[in-house]
A protein has these predicted regions:
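Cell-envelope/extracellular polymer assembly enzymes that use nucleotide-activated donors
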Residues: 3-5, 36, 182
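Short hydrophobic beta-strand elements that form part
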Residues: 5-8, 38-39, 66
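Short, well-formed alpha-helical segments that are part of the catalytic scaffolds
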Residues: 13-28
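Donor nucleotide-sugar binding loop of glycosyltransferases
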Residues: 13-16, 44, 73
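Conserved donor nucleotide-binding strand/loop of the catalytic core
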Residues: 35, 49-83
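A conserved acidic beta->alpha catalytic loop
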Residues: 41-50, 96
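Acceptor/aglycone-binding surface of glycosyltransferases and processive sugar-polymer synthases
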Residues: 68-83, 88-91, 100-177, 204-225
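Catalytic donor-sugar/metal-binding loop of nucleotide-sugar-dependent glycosyltransferases
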Residues: 175, 184-202
């Protein structure tokens, strides 16, 4: 068993993913952690798979969690958590916006988060205005259904002990896109304490953050809203 598994849900990141992974390797090696990187590739239709396959040939700390079909962000994230053979799980996005240099702050607090979760709070968030507006709008409904003091419930920079997931895993597939909103809501529902840590939020390494087309937002919002209602009504 590894001490730490870093789970990367990856989709269409052929030009940037190796730089992202190498940045994390550099920081984790400095901390002398027994770690692995879980490559939860999610049915990319560019050259991401072949780029990652070459990378894995030269790195024994990489866990291959690649599939042909697209599982979606939620499916890829949950799958990566399940295959990770480690005491601690860190989940981060794979676009370079999560700064590896922030991780030492999380790791130094790991003994304080037994049976709890530590989530990042993105300072000066580098996302589009539309994405920020959607987060604020959905955040209102999230808070009304699951009151909490978390400043950034959708932040994809989350550390927890793997054993904790058994308390909430039955709820985690209730939404397709808004995984971390649901994760935080499930923790609130099960009275799992959540700690927050300010983190740096960077521009993407390459390309633009995926934002759904405007005409798709109503159905996406409704689906995720219904997922939160389902969680609210669940035992």
């Amino acid at each position: 068993m590894f001490e730490l598994a870093v789970n990367f849900p990856i989709h269409n990141e052929e030009k940037s993913i190796i730089g992202v992974l190498n940045e994390w390797i550099f920081e984790l090696d400095k901390l002398k952690i027994d770690y692995c990187l879980v490559i939860s590739e999610d049915g990319s239709n560019d050259k991401t798979k072949s780029v990652l396959s070459r990378f894995m040939l030269n790195n024994k700390r990489v866990i291959d969690n690649m599939v042909e079909e697209k599982r979606g962000y939620t499916g890829a994230t949950i799958s990566g958590i399940k295959v990770a053979d480690a005491k601690y799980i860190l989940c981060v996005d794979s676009d370079g916006q999560c700064d590896p240099s922030d991780f030492v702050k999380f790791w130094n607090k790991r003994f304080e988060i037994s049976d709890s979760v530590m989530i990042g709070n993105r300072k000066n968030r580098k996302d589009t205005n539309l994405r920020l507006l959607c987060s604020k709008f959905f955040g209102i409904f999230h808070y009304l259904m699951f009151p909490n003091k978390i400043k950034d419930p959708s932040c994809p920079y989350v550390l927890f002990e793997k054993k904790l997931i058994k308390n909430i895993d039955i709820y985690l597939n209730y939404v397709d896109e808004a995984f971390w909103w649901l994760f935080v809501a499930a923790c609130v529902k099960k009275k799992i304490k959540i700690y927050q840590m300010d983190i740096n939020h960077r521009e993407r390494f390459i390309g633009m953050t995926q934002v759904y087309k405007l005409h798709k937002f109503p159905i996406i919002f409704i689906k995720n809203f219904l997922g939160l209602i389902k969680l609210k009504l669940a035992n």
